[in-house]
Amino acid sequence: MQKVTVLCVGKLKEKFYMDAAAEYAKRLSRFCKLELVELPEERLPEDPSPAQIEAALLKESAAILAKLPSGAALIALCVEGELRSSEALARRMDAWASQGMGQLAFLIGGSFGL
């Protein structure tokens, strides 16, 4: 069974989202071993400078690398990225599994990206 880790910078705060994440984890448990890892988002002032943002991103990237499962294929998710249907993603995950990628890590960045 494929192991899937979702690394996200920032925490789920609203009960609706926490409940939805739990429901998806339950539904996916038949197909993969799912782990959700929430990493703290670096605190920044209200109007951060580019240097402050860069420093925060470096700290967040260190936290991501520390939690990234060894040997996992890393897939960064982005709002500007390619939209895939559930079926297309399932086919892609099957292809990765066939290629020996038994462990996947999906990454969701914080407010200022990755």
Residue ranges and their predicted role:
Residues M1-L28:
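N-terminal beta1-alpha1 ligand-phosphate binding loop
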Residues V6, I75, G109:
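Conserved RecA-like P-loop NTPase ATPase core
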Residues L7, E35-V37:
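General small-molecule cofactor/ligand-binding pocket signal
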Residues L12, V79-E82, G110-G113:
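Short glycine-rich anion-binding loops that position phosphate/pyrophosphate groups of nucleotides
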Residues F16-Y17, S85, L114:
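Secondary-structure boundary/capping motif
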Residues S29-E35:
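A generic structural motif
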Residues L39-E42, S111-L114:
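Mobile beta-alpha loop/short-helix "lid" or hinge segments that flank ligand
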Residues P40-L104:
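S-adenosyl-L-methionine/SAH cofactor-binding core of RNA-modifying enzymes
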